[in-house]
Regions:
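Bacterial N-terminal signal peptides
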Residues: 9-19
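Transmembrane beta-barrel domains of Gram-negative outer membranes and organellar outer membranes
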Residues: 25-291
């Protein structure tokens, strides 16, 4: 595990160094929101000498009039709405560190994800999955498979309570195992600087026999407090139930997001397991970049 942490720390340090030199709010959706803010400020200069600065993270931007905070992944475990307005692209590198409770070596599941804004409240994500298995004698790194994901928001932001979004993911892992993962995504603002998200999840393999489907019913819930334009702190919770193995897993722990600029951001979420069926901990680290 020490080798894994040292490797991830070096990678994140390099990524941090490369992002500090870029400018603010480059996507077309964010530019639109900032342009409107500047116009409002100029038009009101003669009337107001000292005024409170608008809070950009909650500024409604883009074709769907969504708040700017939804244009990046605020919560590693919980998705909210669509992140990519029309004609925009995002990239994310994931490190999903799973530490078993029995003391065996950790497994680091990695994925490279590209998200595309298709318009009409649709988003398409493409993934490549790899895995690193730690072992003092023979650690290994290998290819796991591919998957794709489609999201559809039922309405523009704020038109329906919770901003419901339909999510479907199809996986092809180890070259032979197909899986599906439908979800319902919910999320919104709460209070002055609070945000929340809730996902209802079914994850299963495609198989004729129920025993081979390995179905898991789950939900994730997250709350975040936007401290400023760069920093968000919060907490996440996960529950998973496997209806074949009859196992339940409970997790809860802190999360944070730091935005380097309008392009890059870093998410860290650490959730210790709360019961014996759960892993000792699940830690997710994400580096994201908006083109």
């Amino acid at each position: 595990m020490r080798k894994t942490i040292q490797t991830l720390s070096l990678m994140l340090a390099l990524l941090f160094t490369t992002t500090l030199s870029f400018g603010q709010y480059s996507s077309s959706a964010i530019k639109q929101g900032v342009t409107e803010t500047l116009k409002d400020t100029v038009s009101n200069l003669e009337e107001v000498v000292v005024t409170a600065k608008p809070y950009p993270q909650f500024k409604l931007v883009g074709e769907y009039k969504q708040p700017a905070w939804t244009l990046v992944r605020k919560f590693p475990s919980t998705r909210v709405y669509v992140m990519t307005p029309p004609n925009t692209i995002m990239y994310e590198k994931w490190f999903d560190i799973r530490t078993p409770r029995d003391g065996s070596p950790s497994e680091v599941r990695m994925r490279d994800e590209f998200a595309f804004g298709l318009g009409k409240r649709l988003e398409l994500d493409l993934y490549m999955h790899t895995v690193y298995k730690e072992n003092d004698l023979a650690s290994s790194f290998g290819f796991r498979g591919f998957s794709w994901e489609i999201r559809y928001a039922l309405a523009d932001w704020g038109k329906i309570w919770g901003n419901p979004t339909l999510y479907f993911e199809h996986k092809l892992l180890q070259g032979k195992r197909m899986g599906i993962e439908p979800k319902i995504l919910l999320g919104d603002r709460i209070g002055a600087k609070g945000i929340w998200g809730l996902n209802l999840i079914l994850e299963a393999d495609v198989a004729k026999e129920r025993v081979d489907q390995n179905r898991e019913w789950a939900y994730t819930a997250s709350y975040g407090n936007i401290i400023n334009d760069d920093l968000t702190l919060g907490v996440s919770h996960m529950f998973r139930y496997n209806d074949v193995k009859q196992t339940k897993e409970l997790y809860v722990g802190p999360m944070l997001q730091y935005r380097f600029n309008g392009h890059g951001y870093l998410n860290v979420e650490h959730m210790p397991g709360l019961n014996q069926s759960a892993k000792l901990s699940r830690t997710i680290i994400i580096f994201g970049w908006r083109f």
